[in-house]
């Protein structure tokens, strides 16, 4: 299996941590994609993921799976004898999904919008609106306060153990701090 990724990008880092926690990282060939040079726009890459984003998992038969949590779900289901990071019981699975959605909608998306609209990094690919980016940044601050409240007296955000929720919140917080 091959994981097409960019070492510094947050979503591939989430997949790598997920794989490391499951003890599977050494079973994957990591293929670096230079998004700054536009390698993700090449016909070869677009054939793997028409959304032109990393990460992309390419299976032995050539099937490609894109999107961070879809890749994580593949490994969760394919390797049931490894630590469960997406929940074991129906309740745990529901709680993990709830938290993953909250982090996605109220933390990841606004952090990404803040970065894209305030740094100029994507100015050649989009029309950044600084005010929108700043407003998104304020929403990120509010959600970070919410996360801190939820963690008071606890080691983990969900299920009283380490899950994908902790991975996703960790990397997004690191990105939010950098933005």
Language-model segments: residues:
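GST-like fold's C-terminal all-alpha helical module
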Residues: 103-179
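GST-like domain detector, emphasizing the conserved glutathione-binding G-site
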Residues: 1-134
């Amino acid at each position: 299996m091959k994981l097409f990724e960019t070492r510094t990008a947050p979503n591939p880092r989430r997949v790598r941590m997920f794989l490391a926690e499951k003890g599977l990282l050494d079973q994957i060939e990591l293929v670096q994609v230079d998004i700054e040079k536009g390698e993700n726009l090449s016909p070869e890459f677009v054939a793997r993921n028409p959304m032109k984003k990393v990460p992309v998992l390419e299976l032995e038969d050539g099937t490609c799976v894109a999107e961070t949590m879809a890749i994580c779900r593949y490994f969760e289901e394919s390797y049931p004898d490894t630590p469960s990071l997406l929940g074991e019981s129906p309740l745990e699975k529901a709680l993990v999904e709830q938290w993953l959605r909250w982090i996605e909608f109220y933390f990841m998306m606004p952090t990404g919008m803040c970065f894209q609209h305030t740094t100029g990094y994507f100015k050649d690919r989009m029309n950044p609106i600084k005010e929108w980016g700043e407003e998104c940044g304020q929403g990120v601050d509010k959600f970070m306060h919410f996360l801190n409240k939820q963690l008071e007296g606890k080691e983990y955000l969900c299920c009283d153990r380490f899950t994908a929720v902790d991975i996703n919140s960790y990397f997004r917080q690191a990105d939010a701090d950098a933005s």
